Swiss-Prot record:
EC numbers, comma separated: 4.2.3.26
Pfam hit, one: Terpene_synth_C
Compartmental location: Plastid, Chloroplast
Needed cofactors: Mg(2+); Mn(2+)
Protein name as annotated: (R)-linalool synthase 1, chloroplastic
GO cellular component: a single term: chloroplast
Source organism per UniProt: Picea sitchensis
């Protein structure tokens, strides 16, 4: 939320010298413990602890900065990156292997062989699909995957399936993997099939000794349980049981491919799992242990080589796109501003972790640019900007014309023009895909985004603490999920007619749930830092206001329960078979939620990018896979 004061238009420690006014700037590096009246008619509650570095200029007015760490990925480093995997020979080798694997899969579909029989054909087919998807190469095998899943579904019944079409009894591993895979592809399958695997006490049964096969079955049960819909108690029971079981297994089994997979799945689950990160991890475990291989050794070897080649071929494209993005940032006003978070590389990494299609460069770069713009505006409205400046910027944005900059302070002029040019450029790109004007969609989203920030600024200026419901309604917009989603998905090259777009964009249930989840989860990790900067309102503080006597721990527990409930509702909105929008049309919107949610797994990954997110950049963008 924005700080309310009048400050000169620039500060030496926050803005490049070309933006500094002619008046002398006197830096003061100390902590301001309290702050009373800032300007006539505007106050900030003196009891709020102000724990930031303030800059005092010659008129004694202060401007806040949040002391975020600087850009971790310098342009000189990005421009120095190189890779040989863009050469034609690698592409040709990958294409050849893909063709050979398709032939093997199609031959399996026609008739049983020596290794695939009527007693194991269902689990073998499901395992092939699962391996292909987890290796990140499924875009090459869409038809083959559909053929396999149609075959498996033809044998699905109210008790699930056995290992093969002629199996006498159903099997937990086959049923759990089938439930997960079929549900993710839109087949109407009920979780009731899991009830039969409980004992007379209503508990999932397991043997006294954990065998490798049983551990693998429980792992697939855990993976299936994460794709739960509202009201599916058996899925909740399955998640609780399998989580405990797998954590115990990690304590007893030696370090191996299976233990690494268990650790990864427990860590990332589904909602914080990113496809490219999963592929990088699965490449390391696939093929190194018989439990992961396909019945055809040649297929296993070919799939592994395809996965490595695809990872590195896309790596070469990532470098080209990242160099473009880094130049865009360096040549813009952003590189001259030191007060905001510079996270363009991190945002690009998230986009490239959820979409590796070579044709979708506009999506990846657009997501990175739009998200970076949103973050810069977040820091302007939250800390650096004064109320007068914010009102001017809000009015200028709604006018949407370059001439509107003449009323803005210098540092805002550059930001405004970058926003104006980037949004218009993306709209022109989206117009080609959609066959209609899309700029109005974008402008409406940005206006709502900025209005939500102005509301928060007014709350802090008056010392007003809203109700939990009022705060959340506004916070769902100010998180910025809509601006980060709308324009990028419209550039994908896939038409989004109105009846499809209304299932994805505001005010659809999918959009509402995604925004709620991200705002709630985000506040859990940011409220303490924001409170130290004088930003009073958060889901936690508003809940405590509505529930006198409650503690921060009570609030966090309540909010986590809300998030878990909303995630199940989101699963349903994404995967429901009766939706007007196919899963493929909703996938990017859903995956963008997963990308943002990934950053809040352990901390505020937007503000503190030195830890997990830095490793994500290195693992999925900077470093290739050894062939």
């Amino acid at each position: 939320m924005a700080f309310v004061s009048i400050a000169p238009l620039a500060s030496r420690c926050c803005v490049h010298k070309s933006f500094v006014s002619s008046r002398e700037v006197k830096p003061l590096c100390r902590t301001i413990p309290t702050l009373g009246r800032c300007r006539r008619g505007k106050t900030v509650t003196p009891s709020i602890s102000m724990c930031w570095t303030a800059t005092v200029l010659d008129d004694g007015v202060q401007r806040r900065i949040a002391n975020h760490h600087s850009n971790l990925w310098h342009d000189s480093f990005i421009q120095s990156l190189s890779t040989p995997y863009g050469e034609t020979s690698y592409l040709e080798r990958a294409d050849k292997l893909i063709g050979e694997v398709k032939e093997i899969i199609n031959s399996i579909s026609v008739e049983d062989g020596e290794l695939i029989t009527p007693l194991n054909d269902l689990i073998q087919r499901l395992s092939i699909v699962d391996n292909i998807e987890r290796l990140g190469i499924d875009r090459h095998f869409k038809n083959e995957i559909k053929s396999v899943l149609d075959y498996v579904y033809s044998y699905w019944n109210e008790k699930g399936i056995g290992c093969g079409r002629e199996s006498v009894i159903t099997d937990l591993n086959s049923t759990a993997l089938g439930l997960r895979t079929l549900r993710l592809h839109g087949y109407p399958v009920s979780s009731d099939v899991l009830e039969q695997f409980k004992d007379q006490n209503g508990q999932f049964a397991c043997s006294a000794i954990q065998t490798e096969g049983e551990i693998k079955s429980v792992l697939n049960l855990f993976r299936a349980s994460l794709i739960a819909f509202p009201g599916e108690k058996v899925m909740e029971d399955a998640e609780i049981f399998s989580t405990i079981y797998l954590k115990e297994a990690l304590l007893t089994i030696p370090v191996c491919s299976l233990s690494r997979e268990i650790a990864y799945v427990l860590e990332h689950g589904w909602h914080t799992n990113l496809p490219r990160l999963e592929a990088r991890n699965y490449i390391d475990v696939f093929g190194q242990d018989p439990i992961y291989g396909t019945p055809n050794i040649k297929m296993t070897q070919k799939l592994l080589e395809i996965a490595k080649l695809e990872f590195n071929i896309f790596h070469s494209l990532q470098q080209k796109e990242l160099k473009h993005l880094s130049r865009w940032w360096k040549d813009s006003v952003f590189s001259q501003l030191t007060f905001p978070r510079h996270r363009h590389v991190e945002y690009y990494t998230l986009a490239s972790c959820i979409d590796i299609d070579p044709q979708h460069s506009s999506f990846r770069l657009g997501f990175a640019k739009i998200s970076h713009l949103g973050t810069v505006l977040d820091d302007i409205y939250d800390t650096f900007g004064t109320m007068d400046e914010l009102e001017l910027f809000t009015a200028a944005l709604k006018r949407w014309h370059p001439s509107a900059t003449k009323w803005l302070p210098e540092y805002m002029k550059g930001v405004y023009m970058m926003l104006y040019e980037t949004v218009n450029e993306m709209a022109r790109e989206a117009d080609k895909s959609q066959g209609r004007d899309t700029l109005n969609y974008a402008r409406q989203a940005w206006e709502a985004y900025i209005d939500s920030y102005m509301k928060e600024a007014k709350w802090i200026s008056s010392g007003f603490l809203p109700t939990f419901e009022e705060y959340l309604d506004n916070g769902k917009v100010s998180f910025g999920y809509r601006i980060g989603t709308l324009q990028p998905i419209l550039t994908l090259g896939t038409p989004f007619p109105h009846h499809i777009l209304q299932e994805i964009d505001f005010p659809s249930s999918l959009n509402r749930l995604a925004c709620s989840i991200l705002r709630l989860k985000g506040d859990i990790h940011t409220y303490q830092a924001e409170r130290s900067r004088g930003e009073k309102s958060s889901c936690i503080s508003c809940y405590m206001k509505d529930n006198p006597g409650s503690t921060e721990e009570d609030a966090v527990t309540y909010i986590n329960a809300m998030v878990n409930k909303s995630l199940k509702e989101l699963n349903w909105e994404f995967l429901r078979p009766d939706s007007n929008a196919p899963i493929t049309s909703k996938k990017h919107a859903f995956d963008i939620l997963r990308a943002f949610y990934h950053l809040y797994k352990h901390r505020d990954g937007f503000s503190v990018a030195r830890n997990e997110i830095r490793n994500l950049v290195k693992t999925t963008v900077i470093e290739p896979v050894p062939l």
